[in-house]
């Protein structure tokens, strides 16, 4: 069999960025396996932004004349318009987003000018940079969504006021706490997620552009200028690391998985609280669903989907880590598999978070039901033990005495507060009638006024600190977004000069 010399079958056809050393094109099976446009096309805006910065770097180094630079930038503007409008889409012949866009650029600028843009860069440093740009933009979106969720939880905490609920350990009654305290306990992990996103961005704020395939470039292009044009603080310190590192992707996937876990824990409680057995919350009709056969059902689908999707986020992280664990330096094609998992995690959270926040903002709490259940399960026993300690009884003895008191109440089928003075004395002479001063849920909550405690005064302080921290994180995120937007505006503005 002779090999085809038809240019349409060669690897170097439009839409592919390689092929000169091959006598023929790839097999259809390889083409199908290699094609990535079904997921990397969403990087097209970032690819075009990178091409603008690269064109300016080529011009600064003398590889494009002023006229060519201007024509190239104008062609890239036209390319961007065609992508945005849908006039240009990836075709079956395009291996990836880079090849599809080069094909589109050559249609606009011609092959001679369009073909000059590839000098001094590789798909390896391109894709490493574009993924960072995509993730940084979507990190900002998710950051803003998380802030809205924290705001919704904080607003519910403020509205709860002094409402008391059963606090639990091992899902058993433990001690009474303020509902506001419990809701704020879900805010702080989300605040740490916000901080993780900010910490991550500091490490992601490095441009691999200029690293080439792995060893850098001989063309003397200003990688620092490209980095600044694309909104990065600096360029990569090591060209091999620049093209091969994906820890920044894995770390981002971890942060999103952790967000999913934090949502899942809150979801589990909402699902329980929404049952008749608990009866703590009522879901808004707008944020719940019904049954196709049982007319009475009102299901907590958002919470259940959040709980389920947390497993998906964990799976995406696990798959990505498994892909990375055995790769030698530098770039390997395995790294094509880094994008779909993290893209899926981004898209999952960006759909989930608005619905979840709406569910939280519209929850109605049955605080009477919560207060009714708060003293059950002998939840004031620790208050009795600590009262004894304050009256100079060793805690070991106080614990034993209180345990006997619980046993006595349990045997009579009553609560601690229902025991008579004779019942108290029968357990221990230390249990004088004055112990009743701690046998109320209001007194128990108010007495826990140490740092981080559930007393109203401490919870109000905590909520104020939460508001301050979130405002600080929001301001930092807004400032970072403004810096990136200014860099992008400055870079794109040159095309119209």
Swiss-Prot record:
UniProt KW Nucleus keyword: no
Gene Ontology terms for molecular function: argininosuccinate lyase activity
Organism: Clavibacter michiganensis subsp. michiganensis (strain NCPPB 382)
Annotated pathway: Amino-acid biosynthesis; L-arginine biosynthesis; L-arginine from L-ornithine and carbamoyl phosphate: step 3/3
GO BP annotation list: arginine biosynthetic process via ornithine; L-arginine biosynthetic process
Source superkingdom: Bacteria
Family annotation (PROSITE patterns): FUMARATE_LYASES (PS00163)
Protein name in UniProt: Argininosuccinate lyase
Disulfide bond positions: none
Record localization: Cytoplasm
Record has Transcription as a keyword: no
InterPro entries: Arg_succ_lyase_C, Argininosuccinate_lyase, Fumarase/histidase_N, Fumarate_lyase_CS, Fumarate_lyase_fam, Fumarate_lyase_N, L-Aspartase-like
Top EC class for this record: lyase
PANTHER family, A to Z: ARGININOSUCCINATE LYASE
